[in-house]
Regions:
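Glycine-rich beta->alpha junctions and the first turn(s) of the following alpha-helix
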Residues: 107-208
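Glycine-rich phosphate/cofactor-binding loops in nucleotide/flavin-utilizing enzymes
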Residues: 5, 150-151, 155, 229-241
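Internal helix-loop-helix
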Residues: 1-20, 24-30, 70-77, 220-224
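Short Gly/Pro-enriched turn/cap motifs at secondary-structure boundaries
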Residues: 26, 41-44, 68-71, 88-89, ...
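A structural signal for short hydrophobic beta-strand segments in well-ordered beta-sheet cores
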Residues: 51-54
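A short, Trp-centered hydrophobic/proline-enriched beta-strand micro-motif
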Residues: 29-37
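A short core secondary-structure module
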Residues: 63-109
Length: 241
């Protein structure tokens, strides 16, 4: 997740100074990254976020909370979405992204959240109380954060859909083995017509989703904007849930 979803923000929009400082450590695994979008009571409604960053000379002062943040406990570098312009119309034009290092005064972690799956990454709450970060930690341009997110969320959603499809394919293989080995009324349940219908439907849905995701991946890698189609791949992701 850190290298395939979050680091591309730095590679695409970071300054040369930021890249030289952080990219080698990201590549070596010395630090992992996390991105903070979701907030308590707001969810992923970016325009409604309440975490603010107020300019104070050569620094921004961050106040607010984030929740459901993947890698929140173990990350060493955080890409935090903040409101730098509270009067912007529409509201999403006031969003920026700031780089916050672990250990910055005023930054702390809340609970490590319990979850059903994806235990290879932790999920946590983040708290910002008068956290001062230098202006040089601004990713890209002020007020452009929403556009950066919309660009990179395409890749994030495709990656998640690919992972879900891998899970779905393994589920199909496991189920196929089970119905061949499980016997009822003196014969394997794979010989029952209803079982065959269910297995055929599962295989068909996975094949359709695979074709759809492969097409999105190809178009995205060739620079095409597939944001609308990527929103549709929730269907593909549901196969792996």
């Amino acid at each position: 997740m850190s290298s395939s979803i979050i680091v591309p923000y730095l590679e695409r929009y970071g300054t040369e100074e930021q890249k030289k400082k952080y990219l080698p450590k990201c590549v070596s695994g010395e630090i992992t990254t996390a991105i903070g979008m979701t907030e308590p009571g707001i969810g992923s409604d970016l325009a409604g976020m309440r975490t603010t960053a107020v300019r104070d000379g050569d620094h921004y002062i961050i106040n607010g909370q984030k929740t459901f943040i993947s890698n929140g406990i173990n990350a060493g570098l955080f890409f935090i979405c903040v409101k730098t312009d509270l009067t912007a119309t529409p509201a999403h034009k006031g969003i920026s992204i700031l780089l916050v290092e672990d250990g910055t005064p005023g930054f702390s972690r809340g609970r490590k959240l319990k979850k059903l799956g994806q235990h290879s990454t932790d999920t946590a709450e983040l708290i910002f109380e008068d956290v001062r970060v230098p202006v040089s930690n601004l990713l890209g341009e002020e007020g452009k954060g929403f556009y950066y997110l919309m660009d990179k969320l395409q890749q994030e959603r495709i990656m998640i859909a690919i992972g879900a499809l891998v899970v779905a394919e393994e589920m199909l293989k496991t189920t196929m083995t089970f119905v061949k080995e499980r016997h009822a009324f003196g014969k394997p349940i794979s010989s029952f017509q209803n079982t065959q219908f269910e297995m055929a439907e599962m295989a068909t849905e996975i094949s359709m989703a695979q074709t759809f995701v492969d097409d999105l991946t190809y178009r995205h890698m060739n620079g095409e904007n597939v944001s609308t189609q990527v929103s549709m791949d929730i269907i593909a992701k549901n196969l792996g849930m």
